[in-house]
């Protein structure tokens, strides 16, 4: 088990989160501010400060240790550790006086999954007019099927660099420029434009910067594959995280009629540089050209074929855990104050230098679950329940693409 640590600094922000669920008597939360510049007013109920004292570092550390214990095997979706985690959360909420919050009167909202294990080729070959390049699985690239089918075959597809792969009308940004990329493999930068605070959200990542958006945008454009260029600054994590997160069984929601690329992949920036040079181009120059609204897709002068098999595991599931504390005011009890964190992690994967193959996920996200449960304990210590109902929503399969959050927002049927 990888070591974990707790810090008392976590406690103080939690006091604000507890206060967010409390309004003083006589305040229905609907009063108008005195002007557009007036900050929102937050007032603690009389006993909120005392109730908050149940939140302490020792309690947080204990809950994190339990959730990150080897016995939960990394909390991978649709595993025994996943079920044990959900049981732990439900029991903790019940001890705090919360009631089951799912529509059927249980603690759990099912999240249907399809498991996909892609068996990628050891070498992926690319050809230019005059040369050939092979990228090694694991060291240079990580790939997966983009479709819920047992076989994928792509034949002699052209590679096209599409900058960030973003179409955002509200930002006057379109990397595709209506260029026909049907049947092609698209190569794109990670994240979204972040060098200018007036572009997108500056350094804050929007959905446009997420890997799932990029694969979706490529599919809508008719591409057969999409490759994201990884850099540690743009991703916020090293390529090792890609290696451990995007290998083994991957989970998705059951496919609908939405367009999908047949191949999703990541490459290191070093491998991307070799791909660019194979076609007589320079990666740094391509990246620089993408830093403009005037960017247009660029052929890499490279083509590739790839074929692989996948194991498709249909009919599996995980679940969101929902606990609700009914509000005390009949006129406001139908309104919800929601606290949320995801309860899943990466499960069991490649063995590290110490022989450990369990990805315990203390920070990601046992700490978040412990935070929500600590707030629940504080609510249970209040002498009078909040006027609005409080929902503790512990979502599943975040690591697989926000699947639990999507399931809840598609069907927010709590209480």
Roles of regions detected by a PLM:
Residues 135-140, 151-152, 177, 253-284, ...:
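Metal-dependent peptidase/peptidase-like ectodomains
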Residues 135-255, 259-263, 326, 334, ...:
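Extracellular/luminal Protease-associated
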Residues 18-21:
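C-terminal motif of bacterial Sec signal peptides marking the signal peptidase cleavage site
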Residues 25-102, 123, 334:
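N-terminal hydrophobic or amphipathic helices/low-complexity stretches enriched
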Residues 73-197, 299-302, 307-309, 313, ...:
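Noncatalytic luminal/extracellular "stalk/propeptide" segments of secretory-pathway proteins
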Residues 220-233, 237, 245-246, 251-320:
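Long, well-ordered, tryptophan-enriched scaffold segments
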Residues 204-209, 213, 217, 234, ...:
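Acidic/histidine-rich catalytic neighborhood of metal-dependent amide-processing enzymes
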Residues 2-12:
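Bacterial N-terminal signal peptides that target proteins for export
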């Amino acid at each position: 088990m990888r070591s974990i640590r707790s810090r008392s600094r976590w406690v103080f922000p939690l006091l604000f989160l507890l206060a967010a669920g409390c309004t003083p008597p006589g305040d229905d939360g609907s009063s108008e501010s005195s002007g557009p510049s007036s900050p929102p007013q937050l007032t603690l109920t009389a006993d909120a400060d005392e109730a908050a004292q149940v939140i302490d570092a020792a309690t947080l550390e204990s809950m994190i240790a339990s959730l990150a214990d080897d016995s939960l095997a990394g909390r991978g979706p649709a595993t025994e550790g996943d079920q044990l985690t959900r049981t732990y959360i439900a029991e903790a909420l019940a001890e705090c006086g919360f009631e089951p919050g799912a529509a059927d009167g249980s603690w759990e909202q099912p999240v249907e999954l399809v498991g996909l294990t892609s068996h990628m080729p050891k070498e992926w070959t690319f050809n230019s007019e005059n040369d050939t390049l092979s990228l090694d699985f694991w060291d240079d690239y990580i790939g997966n099927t983009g479709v819920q089918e047992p076989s994928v075959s792509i034949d002699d597809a052209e590679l096209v660099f599409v900058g960030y792969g973003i179409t955002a009308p509200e930002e006057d940004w379109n990397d595709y420029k209506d260029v026909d990329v049907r049947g092609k493999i698209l190569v794109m930068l990670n994240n979204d434009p972040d060098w200018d605070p007036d572009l997108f959200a500056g350094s804050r990542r929007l959905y446009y910067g997420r890997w799932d958006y990029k694969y979706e945008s490529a599919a809508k454009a008719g591409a057969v594959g999409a490759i994201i260029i990884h850099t540690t600054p743009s991703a916020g994590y090293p390529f090792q995280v890609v290696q451990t997160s995007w290998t083994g069984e991957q989970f998705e929601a059951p496919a609908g009629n939405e367009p999908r690329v047949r191949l999703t992949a990541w490459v290191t920036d070093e491998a991307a540089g070799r791909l660019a040079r194979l076609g007589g181009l320079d990666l740094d120059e391509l990246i620089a050209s993408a830093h403009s609204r005037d960017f247009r897709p660029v052929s890499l002068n490279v083509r590739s074929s790839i074929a692989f098999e996948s194991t498709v595991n249909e009919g599996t599931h995980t679940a969101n855990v929902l606990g609700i504390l009914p509000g005390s005011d009949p006129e406001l009890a139908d309104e919800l104050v929601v606290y949320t964190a995801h309860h899943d992690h990466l499960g069991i994967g490649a063995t590290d230098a110490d022989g450990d193959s369990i990805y315990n996920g203390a920070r990601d996200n046992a700490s978040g679950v412990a935070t929500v449960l600590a707030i629940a304990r504080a609510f249970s210590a209040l002498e009078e329940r909040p006027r609005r109902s409080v929902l503790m929503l512990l979502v599943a399969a975040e690591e697989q693409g926000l699947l639990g959050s999507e399931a809840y927002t598609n069907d927010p049927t709590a209480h």
